[in-house]
């Protein structure tokens, strides 16, 4: 009889099955098969927080099939993902199938290649109880908070609300940033720039100080004009000249959080979209000439470690493609930030076969997976390349009683930048190359320009900067970052506005209540300490029962006190005004948040119960009737779609997004589907690739 190998997904099963052959049957559990019940707390607080797991309702048939296969099998191996969630799935599978968790029936694959699968199969182990207990403790903590706190929010704010332990901290960060922006008072200042010539070349230097070295930054136009007047007739000469060399190092290969951040900045992906594509790359895709294989190592990792074998393969490719001089002459190492031993057992995210280039892979895959693979491959390869070498120069220009400064650099060896440089969210102060200069050299003033500026408030978080903030505060984890953002948006606490995260009126009301009644729940340091405690459980250095109890005792006391504090009180969530008028009574309509997002409701409620769907004009025209505007709408399940405003007279609808670009053939609205734009007008058939951003 064949041995039974159980993984999470059919895609992973297909790839692994190809490597294992006919002596093994590889099947999928389709994710978790057991969980805490939805209809009750499911935790016996009085008896050491014992969880009361039940089989997930729609998994009954699957569990029956797994049990039947297990009875016929010549052995069972649990090959779920190598992290907390994967260990929990294996623990529950072992429990259901009657396996001894202390026996070596657990295997893991850091990469799903022939070599990676062979290595995993050669090293079976017992289920890691500490790793499972870390997952179990997190699940119990989150259930205690959600199940106990949500009814409080129903009574004091609005029915249907829910609260989460980590999500509440994320909303707090976003709301705090919004308060900073609202309280920010811009301050005026002026830049004074001199464009200076030497021969046929010129450069720009900025006012920095007076002749004594005192920094100067004019606060208003009068001060700027006074400086301009003081510079009339002044000679501009090269006073101080500093030349040097610097080496710019590449960034390390990705971990989960940096992958999500870079994909957001460079590709415009949400964290969820990034992880979906990464999951596909890890579990396996069909590659021409190679068959089905996993293209990257496991994508949920905190570790920056790279195996010696992968480094050697990268350097071999670099030497062949770019030359020996592009290889880093020493072994690059990056210290993994506060990783547990279990977390650091993984590698960073890298291509499983470094020599498999994006150009070769692009023949077999496209869209998100192709873009993400190219980014992962390029970043990893660059991390093993030589530094970028630069000659630097900074100059202080003397002009009467004032000093101007400029700096620049020249690349003498491009090194890793020939392949990859990290994207940034903020506009960096750009250095430019300066013309050859000598100390004492007289410069020609071509233009003196003063420009009014104002200090800027801090920017709202993007997905990338929020993930970075969570990571820097010790809250983010590979398995939680993407779900956190999705959850707070789905719950109506946060919304996206031009790719920035903005708290809704509901989110601000809930955050204010949480801060007032449960300050420790939304405290960043408290949450970071809890994550450290979970890491200690994973490392076998802390008991999960005590960790949960320490938290719950304080939380239960806070909840009891909050009930007393808020007795007879309710938090009023301000309604968001709109320009719409109620069709039933003519009163103004306001924007409210319901189960499936925002909708319009009459401000005269409860006397008038008029409602409307909240629609958004996309700027496009219906390709079917050519008359109605294309409006963004939401389905009954909250999914966004686009339809003609003349419905039901015109029934055109699509899930694909209208774009501003018009059809080159007929002038109709174009729609985006994946990496292409297409015209939906009957008989046209025009298609084009999505234009690349500069």
Spans of model-derived segments:
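Short, hydrophobic-biased segments on the C-terminal half of alpha helices
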Residues: 275-279, 485-486
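Metal- or metallocofactor-binding catalytic centers and their adjacent structured scaffolds
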Residues: 212-252
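C-terminal or mid-to-C-terminal helical accessory/interaction module adjacent to the motor/catalytic core
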Residues: 112-194, 243-244
